[in-house]
Amino acid sequence: MDDFLSISLLSLAMLVGCYVAGIIPLAVNFSEERLKLVTVLGAGLLCGTALAVIVPEGVHALYEEVLEGKHHQASEAKQNVIASDKAAEISVVHEHEHSHDHTQLHAYIGVSLVLGFVFMLLVDQIGSSHVHSTDDPESARPSSSKITTTLGLVVHAAADGVALGAAASTSQTSVQLIVFVAIMLHKAPAAFGLVSFLMHAGLERNRIRKHLLVFALAAPAMSMLTYLGLSKSSKEALSEVNATGVAMLFSAGTFLYVATVHVLPEDTSTNQSGSSLSPRPLPSGKN
């Protein structure tokens, strides 16, 4: 029951913190120039948190259990070993197992990131092909970008929720707090970046609030579903394959796709078009 109470409180704090961080751009009236600056800031926060927070935290969560296990094995070996030759033999065995585990973890890192990126690529392609089948593809393209950006961040937040639910299933408070802090460190900038991007794209404020609410609800809902849906055997199996780290790296792949493929190119293209269009009316003599 303590685990359920803790995951409930963490989910509630995640929901409130994410929504409050995302509502800040809506609560302040920005001019057009300041809105561009806020949008660029949001895009920078998305890319920066993807590279500087999510990927390192996912790798740390992936390696943490193995490193703790090796530490316990080393302490037990020091207590139980009597002869020096036996100690040397056991250290060689531990070193071999350590290198074997590291090669497996390296594979987990790359595969999880690539799967997250490719998953969002497929979602993007399916969504864009569906939108381009409408009557006006030119006007449909910006709306597709808005929907894909929100959908990508919602998928990323859902993967974060799975990571938190898997961490809560381990019954280790320290692991839960580490994962929660890591998620909040990038969910708040992500909410800010999402809202600023949608404002810059011209979406109505009521619809922006709905997008923000869906994004804020995704991680808490998935964390509760993951925690409640896991059986005891499933929890043991997830702890063996480091599901927390794998889920965080998968979410990092989805986050990287949204930040680098949609938000950042959209901002740079609009800024370049605005700067290139401003001096052009001067040399032209046509009215």
UniProtKB/Swiss-Prot annotation:
GO molecular function: androgen binding; G protein-coupled receptor activity; zinc efflux transmembrane transporter activity; zinc ion transmembrane transporter activity
Record-annotated membrane-spanning stretches: 4-24, 35-55, 107-127, 147-167, 177-197, 211-231, 245-265
Taxonomic classification: Eukaryota, Metazoa, Chordata, Craniata, Vertebrata
Cited function: Transports zinc ions across cell and organelle membranes into the cytoplasm and regulates intracellular zinc homeostasis. Participates in the zinc ions efflux out of the secretory compartments. Regulates intracellular zinc level, resulting in the enhancement of AKT1 and MAPK3/MAPK1 (Erk1/2) phosphorylation in response to the BCR activation. Also functions as a membrane androgen receptor that mediates, through a G protein, the non-classical androgen signaling pathway, characterized by the activation of MAPK3/MAPK1 (Erk1/2) and transcription factors CREB1 or ATF1.
Name of encoding gene: Slc39a9
Organism from which the protein derives: Rattus norvegicus
Protein name: Zinc transporter ZIP9
Catalytic reaction equation(s): Zn(2+)(in) = Zn(2+)(out)
Low complexity bias (residue ranges): 273-287
Keywords: Cell membrane, Cytoplasm, Glycoprotein, Golgi apparatus, Ion transport, Membrane, Mitochondrion, Nucleus, Transmembrane, Transmembrane helix, Transport, Zinc, Zinc transport
Glycosylation sites: 29, 242, 271
Chief location bin: Golgi
